[in-house]
Design a protein with these regions (language model features):
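Active-site catalytic microenvironments in core metabolic enzymes, especially phosphate/sugar-handling
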Residues: 1-112
């Protein structure tokens, strides 16, 4: 099929001490968002963890971990898609492609 429109996917960086004010605005404006974790162990800051919990029921949240370690986001109660082997830009493009097909139910398979 021919793709006429790509989905809107935002990107936000997370770090220790992040107040997530900007992230809240971005997540309210996009169909999906890529969160880039810049912590040493790959975890999200407490404020970002809560924000992701709040929004992941109505938008797809993809987490890219810059540390190279595999972090268990489900243990933090997060319903996110992990992109352990992708850069943030690759994850953003993949999310845009996933948004073009509303029949895709398991996004994680595209991010493995």
């Amino acid at each position: 099929t021919e793709i006429k429109d790509m989905g809107y996917v935002g990107m936000v960086n997370d770090y220790i001490g992040n107040d997530v004010y900007t992230a809240q605005k971005i997540m309210a404006s996009y169909e999906s968002v890529v969160v880039v974790s810049d912590t040493a162990d790959g975890s999200l800051s407490p404020a970002m963890t809560q924000l992701v919990k709040d929004v992941s029921g109505y938008i797809k949240v993809i987490v890219v971990n810059n540390s190279g370690s595999e972090y268990d986001y489900a243990a933090d109660g997060l319903n996110v898609i992990t992109a352990q082997t992708m850069t943030s830009w690759q994850a953003r493009i993949m999310a845009m492609l996933c948004l073009t097909d509303k029949n895709i139910t398991d996004w994680q398979e595209f991010f493995n």
